[in-house]
């Protein structure tokens, strides 16, 4: 080392990787690079002084001057040892900081002209406080950082030089390379100590968080280990007492159940994998409960077990006839399915959809189909379901997740070929966010449901053996879903059917439910018919059953209060005592023929209804008014009917300018009830003609049919329901579109025989049959 000026020297430079040497440090170094070895040899041949400086990037084997920091440490080589592998081990002691002013490469190693750095002293008033604070903080730090021995505190307490104290603290802290270099480069001791305190404060915060985490983990592990230890102790005690012989191993039980369930390969492999996970878990852990629940569901779901389908058509027909009166179309369809089943063992289960008004027996019919086919009966109420997960199940990532209702019900049935009743399929909630009906598309597609995937099970499940029967009050079902089902319509019951149903099913059921004996009460046929006429007006029989139940309750009360009373007979004469005043007028719609008042026939979701249409013509300026919560289609029917009347005004004896001098008001009573549909066109036209010509409409005539501008009557839907409504209402004559004549074959004979039905083609026929006087001149 040659002295150039008092504060500058020339010295060999040794680059270091990931190491920063501070003054007063004694540290061994292993040197392997040839240039570094040459540098050490040069130093040893002179005064054993060397400049140690850190590389900015440790990955570079051949660093350039740009790859080295500017400030390093002048050090002395205390010992050098050449190792057999060619590397060199040296013991170094740091002496003083130095700043490189000029760095060159002489071909063998780096040589630098450096300027020695003298540290600035602390002010006396700050020295003691700063050192004490630094020491306290470092003590807190090493108590949290278990890697630094506590003995270092004794060493630090004996250091009186603040510069040496700062460098010693930095040397014992696991700092990043840039932070180590920053400590080396800070010349002011005050700043250097404050920098170290800032780093220690940050590290203490992190170490405290780590300590809390370690404490929680340790506590949890101790709890799990304690539970495991106690469980093992219990097992050992039970074994000593001989109780373990009676308690078989749970894992063996589950493995045996998995094998006996005869799952498909995919499901079995999935379940066995979960069982392996369960073996490695603590029995008391939350995750073990989740896995155990999954395995239980996989075992409970029926994978192969089936009930034997009955193939005796005569017995099946007998069961259907016993359980339900009428409904021949549905019964025929079930018998057709059983007939094919008797010829071919494997056929896809039919997917039927029973559509009809409330109370006609759709749900109870599902039970009868199950009985007649020998299947187990399973029912899901779909009304109000708004989440797809109710059908497909929840994924196991969610807390409290379960399979969907389909899989739950299949597990409850314990066979894979039950009859599945999807009740009220039209009542599922739908909006822009959720559509549970879409989840049923796969279920109700016989080509796809053999691979139904429940989100909880995560494996395919075969639903192709299930017989699905859906029920609905209307056709308000998504088109893709409707397309997958075979639609069977159930119309309302006739009076004779209601009488038979009441006598065969409703009356005996209510006697039993209310604790009556058959010899204590008798409800005559005349009483039942009076209930049908005057106390109910419905397509089904629910209200009829409620009225019979009401009679039975009052009969029980009378028998208990009057001990002398042994038998009660209810007939049409004393019915009022049990049910009160009549609620409806049967066969008395208007009583007398009236001008501008026509009886139309309407279809609703609960069956057919009689629809009164009123029209009044007054002097005015040609204003047309319609009231009664009428929909757009019905409003258009009124306008079409008015145009027909204007086009035939001459023939009807009406002045041509009537529409300019008269205001016409069309009203449909029960204004709070919305009404719509095209089938009231003929009735609207008849009411307008009656009002304009002062020609009364016959009160015993009802009509239905859409009208065109040329007076043609177009066909309508729901004819059976409308004719049943006319029959219930005591109507004698019904006018229907001519093209609906073919639908009369579906109407019960007693209804057709009780009505005078006229198929009509033109409005002229309607007016001639419905008005008192022949309107045409």
From Swiss-Prot:
Keyword ATP-binding listed? The answer is yes
Q: Where in the cell is it found?
A: Cytoplasm
- Give the keywords, sorted: ATP-binding, Cytoplasm, Hydrolase, Nucleotide-binding, Protease, Serine protease, Stress response
Does the keyword section mention ATP-binding?
Answer: yes
Q: Which Pfam families match?
A: AAA, Lon_C, Lon_lid, LON_substr_bdg
User: Which reactions fall under this protein's catalytic activity?
Assistant: Hydrolysis of proteins in presence of ATP
InterPro entries registered for this protein in UniProt: AAA+_ATPase, ATPase_AAA_core, Lon_bac, Lon_bac/euk-typ, Lon_lid, Lon_proteolytic, Lon_Prtase, Lon_prtase_N
Q: Which domain of life is it from?
A: Bacteria
Q: Where is the signal peptide?
A: none
One annotated GO molecular function is: ATP binding
List residues of the Lon proteolytic domain: 592-773
Q: Where does the Lon N-terminal domain lie?
A: 11-204
Report the function annotation for this chain: ATP-dependent serine protease that mediates the selective degradation of mutant and abnormal proteins as well as certain short-lived regulatory proteins. Required for cellular homeostasis and for survival from DNA damage and developmental changes induced by stress. Degrades polypeptides processively to yield small peptide fragments that are 5 to 10 amino acids long. Binds to DNA in a double-stranded, site-specific manner.
Subunit text: Homohexamer. Organized in a ring with a central cavity.
Q: Which family does it belong to?
A: Belongs to the peptidase S16 family.
This protein's name = Lon protease
Organism, by scientific name, is Buchnera aphidicola subsp. Acyrthosiphon pisum (strain APS) (Acyrthosiphon pisum symbiotic bacterium)
Gene symbol here is lon
């Amino acid at each position: 080392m040659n002295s150039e000026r008092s504060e500058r020297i020339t010295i060999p430079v040794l680059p270091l990787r990931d190491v920063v040497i501070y003054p007063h440090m004694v540290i061994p170094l292993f040197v392997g690079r040839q240039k570094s070895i040459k540098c050490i040899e040069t130093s040893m041949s002179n005064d054993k002084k060397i400049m140690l400086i850190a590389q900015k990037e440790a990955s570079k084997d051949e660093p350039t001057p740009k790859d080295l920091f500017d400030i390093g440490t002048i050090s002395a080589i205390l010992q050098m040892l050449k190792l057999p592998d060619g590397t060199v081990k040296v013991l170094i002691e740091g002496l003083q900081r130095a700043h490189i002013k000029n760095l060159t490469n002489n071909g063998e190693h780096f040589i630098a002209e450096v300027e020695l750095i003298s540290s600035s002293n602390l002010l006396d008033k700050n020295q003691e406080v700063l050192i004490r604070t630094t020491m306290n903080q470092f003590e807190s730090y090493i108590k949290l950082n278990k890697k630094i021995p506590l003995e270092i505190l004794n060493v630090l307490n004996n250091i009186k030089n603040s510069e040496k104290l700062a460098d010693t603290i930095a040397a014992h802290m696991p700092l990043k390379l840039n932070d180590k270099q920053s400590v080396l480069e800070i010349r002011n001791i005050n700043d250097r100590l404050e920098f170290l305190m800032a780093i220690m404060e940050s590290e203490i915060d992190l170490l405290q968080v780590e300590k809390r985490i370690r404490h929680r983990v340790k506590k949890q592990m101790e709890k799990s280990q304690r539970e495991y230890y106690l469980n093992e102790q219990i097992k050992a005690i039970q074994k000593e007492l001989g109780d373990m012989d009676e308690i078989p191993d749970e894992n063996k039980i589950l493995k045996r159940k998995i094998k006996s369930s005869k799952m498909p390969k995919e499901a079995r492999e999935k379940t066995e994998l979960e069982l392996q996970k369960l073996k490695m878990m603590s029995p008391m852990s939350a995750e073990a409960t989740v896995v155990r629940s999954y395995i239980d569901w996989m075992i409970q779901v029926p994978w192969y077990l089936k009930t034997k389908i009955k193939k005796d058509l005569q017995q099946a027909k007998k069961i259907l006839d016993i359980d339900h009166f009428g409904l021949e179309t549905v019964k025929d369809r079930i018998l057709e399915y059983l007939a094919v089943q008797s010829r071919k063992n494997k056929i896809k289960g039919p997917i039927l959809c029973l559509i009809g008004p409330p109370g006609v027996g759709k749900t109870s019919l599902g039970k009868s189909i199950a009985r007649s086919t020998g299947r187990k009966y399973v029912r899901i109420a779909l009304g109000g379901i708004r989440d797809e997960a109710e059908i497909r199940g929840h994924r196991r990532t969610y807390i409290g997740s379960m399979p969907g209702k389909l899989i739950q019900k299949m597990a409850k049935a314990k066979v894979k070929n039950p009859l599945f009743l999807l009740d009220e399929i039209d009542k599922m909630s739908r909006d822009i966010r959720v559509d549970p009906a879409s989840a049923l598309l796969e279920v109700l597609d016989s080509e796809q449901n053999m691979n139904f995937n429940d989100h909880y099970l995560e494996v395919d499940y075969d639903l192709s053996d299930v017989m699905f029967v859906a029920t609905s009050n209307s056709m308000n079902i998504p088109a893709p879903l409707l397309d997958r089902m075979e639609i069977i319509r159930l119309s309302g019951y006739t009076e004779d059917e209601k009488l038979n149903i009441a006598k065969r099913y409703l009356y005996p059921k209510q006697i039993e439910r209310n604790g009556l004996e058959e010899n204590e009460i008798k409800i005559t046929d005349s009483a039942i018919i009076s209930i049908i006429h005057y106390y109910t007006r419905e397509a089904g029989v629910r209200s009829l059953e409620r009225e019979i139940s009401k009679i039975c309750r009052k009969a029980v009360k009378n028998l208990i209060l009057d001990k002398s009373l042994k038998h009660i007979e209810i007939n049409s004469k004393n019915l009022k005592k049990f049910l009160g005043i009549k609620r409806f007028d049967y066969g008395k719609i208007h009583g007398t023929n009236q001008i501008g008042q026509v009886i139309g026939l309407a279809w609703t979701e609960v069956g057919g209804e009689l629809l009164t249409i009123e029209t009044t013509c007054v002097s005015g300026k040609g204003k047309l008014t319609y009231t009664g919560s009428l929909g757009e289609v019905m409003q258009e029917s009124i306008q079409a009917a008015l145009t027909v009347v204007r086009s035939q005004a001459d023939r009807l004896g009406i002045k041509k300018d009537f529409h300019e001098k008269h205001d016409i008001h069309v009203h449909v009573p029960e204004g709070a009830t919305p009404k719509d549909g095209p089938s009231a066109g003929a009735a609207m036209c008849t009411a307008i003609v009656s009002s304009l010509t002062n020609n009364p409409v016959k009160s015993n005539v009802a009509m239905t049919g859409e009208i065109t501008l040329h007076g043609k009557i177009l066909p309508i839907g729901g004819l059976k329901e409308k004719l049943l409504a006319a029959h219930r209402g005591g109507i004698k004559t019904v006018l229907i579109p001519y093209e609906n004549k073919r639908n009369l074959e579906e109407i019960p004979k007693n209804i057709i025989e009780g009505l005078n039905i006229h198929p009509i083609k033109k409005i002229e026929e309607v007016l001639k049959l419905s008005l008192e006087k022949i309107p045409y001149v």
